[in-house]
Amino acid sequence: MAAGVDEKDKKTIVFLHPDLGIGGAERLVVDAAVGLQNRGHKVVIFTSHCDPRHCFDEARDGTLDVRVRGNSIIPPSLLGRFSILCAILRQLHLILQITLLTSELRTLSPSAFFVDQLSAGLPLLKLLVPTSPIFFYCHFPDLLLVQGRQTWYKRLYRLPFDTWEEWSMGFADSIAVNSSFTKGIVSHTWPSLASKRSLEVVHPCIDVRSTSDSSQNPNDDDKDVLPWTKTGIILSINRFERKKDIALAIKAFASLSPEQRGKAKLIIAGGYDNRVHENVSYHMDLVDLAEGAPYHLKTATAKTVVSALNTSPDVEVLFLLSVPNTLKEILLRSAKLLVYTPSNEHFGIVPLEAMLRGVPVLAANNGGPTETVVEGETGWLRDPNDVGEWAKVMDKVLNGMGEEELKRMGKKGVERVKGRFADTQMAERLEEIIERMPKGDAAQSGMILLVVGAAVAAVAGVISAVYWKLW
């Protein structure tokens, strides 16, 4: 256990997260929970969904106390619709289940709550447990992530949720965001909230200890494991979602001449869930893009380590769906370049994972990566609309840089991550913020009840009207 707090200062911190799957938000939650636990605090994570086959190792191997609640009445969606409404109702169900329907939360006697991604339940949580302060981590305003606002009834349907998001966030005792970029977006989106609250910046982090022995020589341990290491691996790790713009990596790689590519391989790995239609359809679109005109690249898709290792040597683009941590680790250690394609990414944890393992990063010159990747030192920042510039960097890494030059760049990446984004630093920062939060007053419950009741009635009226229109 890492050096932590004195016995008298140990707290019980309860996390609330909607769906503990595999993604950047979930990685942050797991890292925050493990970090606080390593400092001596008791940590319990409540979530409405956690599939042992599709979650991070710490959530399934006993490292963390993960409890699934609030999932027995409301489904994640209704015929593919109303996902935000269902998510809110599932969160409210979870809160009611652990507070009123059982004594589970009372038994834990939480010192503080860590809530992220969904703020809708904060008023109810504050009402039922007014003495425990709430820390809310805003990854990005949800209202800016929603697609398909073209129709008037969809805009009307979203209006109460968008309003509720800002209003409910005001019930948090402290609010943090994941980057200065996100802080600017939040301040612009909700100027009233930003004027009343000081938004903390708490960068996501990674565990720097598990790679400390081998980060300086990232390829040495894995040359005999992956058959493609010597030919050059360009790696992309992202969820199979269109907003991640994975197509950019394929277009840039395909822009290289056969001589420039040589026997190099573009490996596209990432989160993939058969339940999510976009994951399935986007993977198919990417395969069609790579194989079709004008690129005509040879592709293969693998879902297991064995099938990945058995792919034909002449495969140019390899898709790996929902890679386990062990294979992801090997890929990161074996890659020559990590390409991170999303534009205006809120933060982006994958570039840190690559830099920690001595791998240079090519990322978009906007959003979170501008706070992590140092141009020309730990990687490159390029315009995501200029495929040619991305191709030039790929060519430079594959053909224009020697091993020593790549190692020097990799070493600077390791130093930057360990100096700025270590997991111990995030845990200490969270601990400091939680310690500063004032304890609530049970006498506030009556006023909160009146406010919450009026708000619920108003929202229910709007949703009901739109519900009948949509159906």
Curated annotation (Swiss-Prot):
Enzyme Commission no: 2.4.1.132, 2.4.1.257
Question: What job does the chain carry out?
Answer: Mannosylates Man(2)GlcNAc(2)-dolichol diphosphate and Man(1)GlcNAc(2)-dolichol diphosphate to form Man(3)GlcNAc(2)-dolichol diphosphate.
Q: Where in the cell is it found?
A: Endoplasmic reticulum membrane
From which domain of life does this come?
Answer: Eukaryota
Q: How does it sit in the membrane?
A: Single-pass membrane protein
Protein's pathway: Protein modification; protein glycosylation
The question of whether Transmembrane helix is a record keyword is answered with yes
Give a single Pfam family match: Glycos_transf_1
Keywords, A to Z, come to: Endoplasmic reticulum, Glycoprotein, Glycosyltransferase, Membrane, Transferase, Transmembrane, Transmembrane helix
What GO terms describe the biological role, i.e. biological process, of this protein?
A: dolichol-linked oligosaccharide biosynthetic process
Disulphide-bonded residues: none
The reaction(s) this protein catalyses = a beta-D-Man-(1->4)-beta-D-GlcNAc-(1->4)-alpha-D-GlcNAc-diphospho-di-trans,poly-cis-dolichol + GDP-alpha-D-mannose = an alpha-D-Man-(1->3)-beta-D-Man-(1->4)-beta-D-GlcNAc-(1->4)-alpha-D-GlcNAc-diphospho-di-trans,poly-cis-dolichol + GDP + H(+); an alpha-D-Man-(1->3)-beta-D-Man-(1->4)-beta-D-GlcNAc-(1->4)-alpha-D-GlcNAc-diphospho-di-trans,poly-cis-dolichol + GDP-alpha-D-mannose = an alpha-D-Man-(1->3)-[alpha-D-Man-(1->6)]-beta-D-Man-(1->4)-beta-D-GlcNAc-(1->4)-alpha-D-GlcNAc-diphospho-di-trans,poly-cis-dolichol + GDP + H(+)
For molecular function, the Gene Ontology terms on record are: alpha-1,3-mannosyltransferase activity; GDP-Man:Man1GlcNAc2-PP-Dol alpha-1,3-mannosyltransferase activity; GDP-Man:Man2GlcNAc2-PP-dolichol alpha-1,6-mannosyltransferase activity
Which residues are sugar-modified? 178, 279
Family to which the UniProt record says this protein belongs: Belongs to the glycosyltransferase group 1 family. Glycosyltransferase 4 subfamily.
The protein, known as: Alpha-1,3/1,6-mannosyltransferase alg-2
Q: Which PANTHER family match?
A: ALPHA-1,3/1,6-MANNOSYLTRANSFERASE ALG2, ALPHA-1,3_1,6-MANNOSYLTRANSFERASE ALG2
Q: Its GO CC terms?
A: endomembrane system; endoplasmic reticulum membrane
Residue stretches spanning the membrane: 446-466
Name of the top EC class for this enzyme:
transferase
* Taxonomic path: Eukaryota, Fungi, Dikarya, Ascomycota, Pezizomycotina
